Design a protein with these regions (language model features):
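Long, low-complexity, charged/polar intrinsically disordered regions in eukaryotic proteins
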Residues: 5-43
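Short acidic, hydrophobic short linear motifs in intrinsically disordered regions
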Residues: 57-68
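Short amphipathic alpha-helical interaction patches enriched in hydrophobic/aromatic residues
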Residues: 52, 70-74, 93
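A short, conserved structural fragment
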Residues: 90-98
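Short, positively charged loop/turn segments that connect secondary-structure elements
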Residues: 67-83
Length: 112
């Protein structure tokens, strides 16, 4: 019965997706960032970029906005993952800090 084999196949591939990790980057040279679930990384990254596409926010505002968006659907510490992914996005030149006081975060203009 081939149906049983298909079921097992699907289960295994789902597991692999879930367990895939990404080594996040750190904006300061010589510092290493965390290795986290790729699925969680993708979810947090998408939300951070969506939030910052609307306006510049301070660190606190950004983390609060992120928490509001994912608190009902995210497993794990939202602030911890938010911070990890935010640093990674800075290291990849996708977001940047402003020179204003208080310091804010924004999307880098070069990105399409």
């Amino acid at each position: 019965d081939g149906a049983m084999d298909d079921h097992i196949q699907i289960k295994v591939s789902n597991m692999n997706i879930k367990d895939e990790q990404i080594q996040t980057l750190h904006p300061q040279p010589g510092k290493t960032n965390k290795k986290i679930s790729l699925k969680k990384y993708a979810k947090i990254k998408k939300q951070l970029l969506a939030i910052l596409s609307k306006k510049e926010l301070t660190h606190t505002e950004l983390m609060e906005a992120l928490y509001e968006k994912v608190k009902d659907s995210f497993e794990g510490g939202v602030q911890w993952y938010g911070e990890t992914v935010k640093l990674d996005l800075e290291a990849r030149d996708i977001i940047e800090r402003t020179n204003s006081k208080p310091e804010k975060y924004r999307l880098k203009k070069a990105n399409p």
